[in-house]
Amino acid sequence: MTVPRSTLRLQFHRGFTFDDAAKHVEYFAALGISHVYASPITTAEPGSMHGYDTVDYTQVSAECGGEAGLKRLVDKLRAHDMGLIIDTVPNHMGVGGSSNAWWLDILEWGRHSAYARHFDVDWHSPDPALRGKVLLPTLGASYGEELAAGRIALHFAADLGRFYIGYGPHVFPVCPTDYASILQSADRSDLNALAERFHGLTTQPTDHPRAAEGRDMLREFVAQNGGTAIEFALETYSSGDPVTRDRLHRLIERQHFRLAWWRTASDEVNWRRFFDISTLAGVRVERPEVFEAVHALPFRLYQEGVVDGLRIDHVDGLAEPREYCQRLRQRLTELRDTAPYVVVEKILGRGEPLRDDWPVDGTTGYDFMNDVGALLHDPAGAEPLAQTWAELTGRSPRFADEALAARRKILAENLSAELDRAARALHRIARDSLSTRDFTFTTLRRVLTELVVHFPVYRIYPQNGLRSTADNVYFEQALEGARRSLARADHVALERVNAWLGGSAEEAPAGRGGVPQQQSPNGAPPSHAGSARRTAQTLFSQLTAPVAAKAVEDTACYRYGRLLSRNEVGADPGEFSLSVEQFHASNLERSQRFPHAMLATATHDHKRGEDVRARIAVLSEIAQDWSATLRAWSTLNAPHRRALDSKPVSSVGQDTSYDWAPGPAAEAMLYQTLVGCWPPDLQPDDEAGVKELAERVAQWQLKALREAKLQTNWLAPDEAYEAACREFLFDILAPQRRDGFLKELSAFVARIGRAGALNSLQQTVLRLASPGIPDLYQGTELWDFSLVDPDNRRPVDFAKREAWLAQTPPSEFLSSWHDGRVKLAVVQRVLALRAHLPELLSHSEYLPLAVRGKHASNVIAFARRHGNAWAVVVASRLAAGLLGEKGDLPMVDPEKWENTAVEMPPDLSARALFDWLSPAAPKVDENGLLYLRDALGAMPIAVLVEDGVPRS
């Protein structure tokens, strides 16, 4: 297996192509990267900036450079001994435009499309209006309104010989069985003759070739005679006249789709979406033919040696993640002699392990991002900050309360259709037994709701219809929550649902007196019973996962603001901090179970850049100070609040009412965000710089307000409230405030900036030296003060980074830490060590090291050992109090460490060590102690190796 030493995540799109990346390969190599880790490379919706809306799995994106461009990039990578890992998206496809041939085919032919089973469509909807149809919630207003306004119209694509319903940029193919009536409507002999080609046509697959021949004739007819005749036919379906509009409506009603207002999606959509996004349709990759079709391109590229590994997007969306990973591993292994490198995007809950029976190399690193992020937080700040949040906002101090409320809201308002579908699956099971046939759909829906809202992780992974012991750990928690919430009368149904969802083996349905009912002749349960249970289990799992993502990450994390540095993808804001011992335990477990898992601290999906989080984490160390600052700023900026509903604006700083904009919660979160993302070198009198920052923060603010779904949301935006929030932001950052709030904000950031930078360097070295494969998100080798997308996907100035790359020890840049070169140097130096001694930081033992002395709690240390080679990593932590008010460097004055020392392994007591990051060569004394005043005398972090290892 080609195991990466380190990866660099690059976001490809038409503004940054494969050829653009190829220009910087020399820089990537010099930085120490072994593999470029590419965003999805398959053809996506036109203009896609992320690639996760695939429309053609078989082609490399032409906008990104096509297959030729990809191979040029790979040739450049190979010339520098580098490889390529690609992101694959097997869970869903983009269906929001007119570029997805598979999707257009099912709209054209319905259940008889060759791709009808490629997508997760419920063709047997209980709604007669949707039976055999696909709901298309794409209209900007009600269907009747859009039809009357003429925005829905019949069109003809001359180059394809196809009739279609057009709506804006959308194309909805008309079934060829209707072509004859359309052509005959013009009452022209030439069109009547063409109509004969379509008479008697059915939707059966055997008739599809005949339809294709008819379309060819239509295309030839128009090419030879022009489009005038077809225009006559189209006029008979014009929306401008009531009669022809009714004909158009009846034509649309006969199609295999139902056009609907976009607001209907949450309640009525009859196909699986990616989360609640109605432009992304779930793909049934569990079907062998779909699996092969989806992976044909990556399999070929892997077999050809173009690609070295795969990242699997949203593995929890799949029907069978375990089986998928097993099949993927088997197929890749068949294609090449070397073992493939495969990682999965899997969000792990608190204490949840990645399953051992998944043949993958690990996760994409959100679990490490959570661990190292929590390590930066002082547990002493948890309660006072929660209390401050509750007092200022009137909201709960517990994240769990916000998460539970958000789960209920998401189920009721965003994923109601998905909940109904899962409940119907349970209801079908209930109807198969005399003992459960009286469980109503409403009862089962109520029971299912409580299980889902209390489910603590993304999902379960049943095997052969039964949950595993690991599954039961989390299912029991959901059961307990459901029992507390449900009326006792529903507990019987709850226990049966528990059994159906994998809690017990299948039993023959029992009738009165325990006599089995509805058995086959050999006494077994009905043959469909097992299938029905597995369907219900799949639908349950494909419901809990999006509910967790949308409710926790995309709702509660925007409502709860104790400290925003913990509100991150893959994190639990209720888990405020992690001890050194817990961090070591996680590293040890990873080194033993998934030593090649990715280690991330920034991603294309993060809510705040890694250095934003590192700076905000400092507030946990100064909780009382921050609480006072929040109150002071709230009072200072009270005059800039905006009135809502003509009510007077409070001038009181601590006003927990929500009659004003932005409101207490949004205001408190805004201050944290400004503190976190304020650039280190930005001055309050820099009008252009402050305005640029304000625009970026305003973009974040709008998204945050809508995601919170409190006073505005994506479904029904309150534009007046949003505008008032924006005005408040620009008012408090206006140039005339440079001697007021702006000055205070800048001064506060300057006061905690060194501690934030120290946290950043600690986080950086831990990612680079911990067990696993360090992943670098594009551009974050310098300070990363980005916010949520699209801010974290801005163009990267690689030329600047390349110009700043040097062989100079990081300690030389510490005095100018504001520009970020010290971070760049740390990344380069530690990755160079990985290149010099690849086994030492990848396949080695992980040994936590004890620290003693006055400030032992302010240090983390561990050793990596491979054979006779050693590396010792030491880093300052929770150092805001030790830094003090004086000084310019993000490091503790060496003398302040006093008697604090690392207890070194006996094997290192007599060896000469030097710091890989500075000229220092600290000594281990005769008692095996390494004093921090020596180890951290030049930098807040150290990577100690034996003398004799080349420094460059």
Ranges and model annotations:
Residues 1-46, 58, 63, 71, ...:
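Carbohydrate-interacting/catalytic domains
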Residues 48-61, 99, 103:
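Surface-exposed, active-site-proximal loop segments in enzymatic domains
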Residues 306-312:
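Active-site groove signature of glycoside hydrolases
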Residues 456:
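Acidic/aromatic/glycine-rich contiguous surface patches that form carbohydrate-binding/processing clefts
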Residues 73-121:
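Hydrophobic or amphipathic alpha-helical targeting/insertion segments
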Residues 20, 26, 38, 82, ...:
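Activation on extended, non-transmembrane soluble regions of large proteins
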Residues 91, 312-318, 815:
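Conserved short loop/turn motifs at secondary-structure junctions
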